């Protein structure tokens, strides 16, 4: 009997060791962190000193996120995900993290809305999203299983727009302690005024998307200097907004724009993302 009990104890111990060693590959953990604070400029600090004032450093906004990681100790390359103007949805909170973890990446999905009591930003803007992305990067820099030198930023729709804003030359990126290595933007709103990029970027758009017109992305690419990191633009024919999201198998119209899943194009885009991340985060 003692032998049997001891054997059961060893089995249980082995089971717990496997279960508790890190996070399982298909699980996510609710984490809390802050958006990157808006740093005080040297000029503002200098003027305050001249007037005998002491300025306190601004604080970031408290945020929630969902952290997933492959099994093992790492350090792993990682991807920060930014949702669109409608907030969290299945494909961003679950499907993309599962996919990326299976490819060997740690993933942090940023929830920009819950702590701000925001439902959506489809008719407004939230410029703080860029600071949310860098707050997530700061959080990942403190995780010993993440290789902070190999982190990509990836956003969808409004999150894709924030991704482009957060990786443009002479933008807020230059004020941040940590930098992204690459960026992926699904159906973002591009602007020629965004200029050169600070990292290689992959943009994926549909030619029937009138919410995030691909033509604007073409215009930006046409104005890149020879010194800019490469921006790859994939435009898919006959494709609308949210083409990678199975939630929209039945297309719907929102604010005059069509959201519709396209499984064939989704698979093509997923393959492009995998190759792009492998190219720029491999070492």
Where are these regions (language model features)?
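Alpha/beta-hydrolase active-site loop
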Residues: 123-144, 165
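Short glycine-enriched nucleophile-adjacent loop
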Residues: 160-174
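N-terminal cap/lid segment of alpha/beta-hydrolase-fold proteins
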Residues: 26-73
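Short substrate-entry loop that stabilizes the transition state in hydrolases
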Residues: 74-76, 81-119, 210-214
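Short beta-strand/loop motif that positions the catalytic acidic residue
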Residues: 203-205
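Short alpha-helix in the alpha/beta-hydrolase fold that links the catalytic acid
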Residues: 199, 213-223
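C-terminal catalytic histidine-bearing segment of alpha/beta-hydrolase fold enzymes
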Residues: 230-283
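Alpha/beta-hydrolase fold nucleophile elbow
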Residues: 146-157
């Amino acid at each position: 009997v003692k032998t049997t009990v001891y054997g059961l104890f060893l089995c249980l111990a082995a089971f717990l060791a496997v279960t508790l060693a890190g996070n399982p590959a298909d699980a996510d953990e609710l984490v809390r962190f802050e958006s990157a604070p808006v740093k005080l400029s040297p000029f503002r600090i200098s003027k305050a000193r001249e007037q005998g004032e002491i300025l306190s450093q601004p604080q970031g906004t408290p945020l929630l996120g969902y952290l997933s990681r492959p099994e093992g100790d790492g350090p792993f390359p990682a991807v920060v995900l930014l949702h669109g103007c409608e907030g969290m949805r299945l494909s961003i909170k679950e499907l993309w993290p599962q996919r990326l973890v299976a490819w060997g990446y740690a993933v942090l999905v940023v929830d920009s809305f819950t702590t701000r009591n925001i439902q959506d930003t489809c008719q407004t803007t939230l410029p703080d999203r860029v600071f949310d992305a860098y707050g997530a990067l700061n959080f990942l820099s403190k995780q010993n299983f993440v290789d902070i030198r190999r982190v990509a930023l990836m956003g969808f729709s409004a999150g894709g727009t924030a991704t482009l804003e957060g990786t443009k030359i002479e933008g807020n990126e230059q004020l941040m302690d940590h930098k992204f290595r690459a960026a992926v933007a699904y159906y973002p709103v591009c602007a020629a005024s965004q200029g050169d990029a600070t990292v290689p970027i992959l943009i994926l758009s549909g030619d029937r998307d009138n919410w995030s017109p691909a033509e604007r992305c073409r215009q930006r690419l046409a104005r890149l200097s020879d010194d800019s990191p490469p921006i790859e633009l994939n435009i898919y024919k006959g494709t609308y907004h949210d083409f990678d999201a199975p939630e929209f198998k039945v297309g719907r119209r929102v604010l005059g724009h069509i959201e519709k899943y396209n499984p064939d194009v989704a698979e093509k885009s997923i393959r492009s993302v995998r190759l792009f991340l492998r190219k720029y985060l491999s070492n």
